[in-house]
A protein has these predicted regions:
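Short, solvent-exposed loop/turn segments at secondary-structure junctions
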Residues: 7-9, 40, 67-69, 121, ...
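A generic "structured core" feature
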Residues: 142-144, 158, 178-179, 219
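Short His-Asn-centered micro-motif
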Residues: 25, 32, 54, 145-147, ...
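Residue-level preference for the first positions of well-ordered beta-strands
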Residues: 59, 141-143, 185-188
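Conserved RecA-like P-loop NTPase helicase motor core
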Residues: 152, 165-224
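Conserved strand-helix element at the start of the C-terminal RecA-like helicase core
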Residues: 138-156
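Inter-lobe coupling linker of SF2 helicases/translocases
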Residues: 1-140
Length: 224
């Protein structure tokens, strides 16, 4: 009943599975009234007397994958997950690379938007190079917000290749030991799992590898 009355959702595909993702809320005034009846108090950060440190933004611009516009126009592209280029079948006596093929089919407005976002982040080699450069630029603790599990796995591989301790907070995994005890750790946080709550103030640098569907998760993540 709560979801039906107060939650706005849309169906999205994550790692090959379809699920409902929260995109916003409705009947908010009614929800606040109901919660207030049970003792809830609503305050802004300023009203609560919380002073957040000044934020300094460093924009690192990267181009989308070269395959982005081809997909956007054709609504289809086959990605080679090994090199993030366009897939070309390579088979010989010893085997083939067919297992590396990822077909992106934008046959609906939702799938078209989803895969377009992935081509800007998950399947964009330039993003990973920019991430590597950022990690090499500091030995401080880093928080990295991401969307898709495959993004995290690729980023984690880069971090471990640079001998950086890794922590993960996602819907499937919670391991924050490196974050707590290693000054040069990198903590990967899935938006849905950690953007709305959690205290990560041991770190003072955040990397947004890719942006979420809606602005609310991004805005809340800045207060972690």
């Amino acid at each position: 009943l709560f979801w039906k009355q107060y939650i706005q959702t849309e169906w999205v595909e994550t790692d090959g599975f379809w699920r409902q993702q929260i995109t916003g809320y409705k009947n908010v005034d009614r929800l606040k009234m109901k919660l207030a009846e049970h003792g809830a108090v609503f305050m802004t950060t300023e009203q609560a007397g919380i002073s957040l440190p000044k934020r300094n933004w460093i924009k690192v611009k990267t181009r989308p994958s070269p395959l982005y516009w081809k997909f956007w126009n054709d609504r289809y592209i086959a990605i080679d997950s090994a090199n993030l280029g366009e897939f070309e079948l390579d088979a010989d006596f010893y085997g083939s690379n067919a297992h590396c093929e990822r077909e992106l089919i934008g046959d609906t407005s939702l799938t078209r938007r989803l895969y377009a976002r992935q081509l800007c982040g998950l399947y964009n080699p330039a993003r990973y190079e920019a991430f590597r450069d950022l990690v090499n630029s500091t030995e401080d603790r880093l928080i990295v917000f991401y969307n898709f599990t495959e993004e995290m796995e690729r980023l984690k591989g880069i971090a471990k290749g640079l001998n950086r301790p890794v922590s993960v907070l996602s819907g499937e995994e919670k391991n924050l030991d490196a974050y707590r005890y290693q000054h040069n750790s990198i903590t990967f946080i899935q938006y849905q799992a950690g953007a709305m709550g959690g205290n990560f103030q041991l770190a003072n640098k955040i990397i947004y590898f890719s942006l979420p569907q809606g602005s609310e998760l991004w805005e809340q993540s800045q207060k972690r």
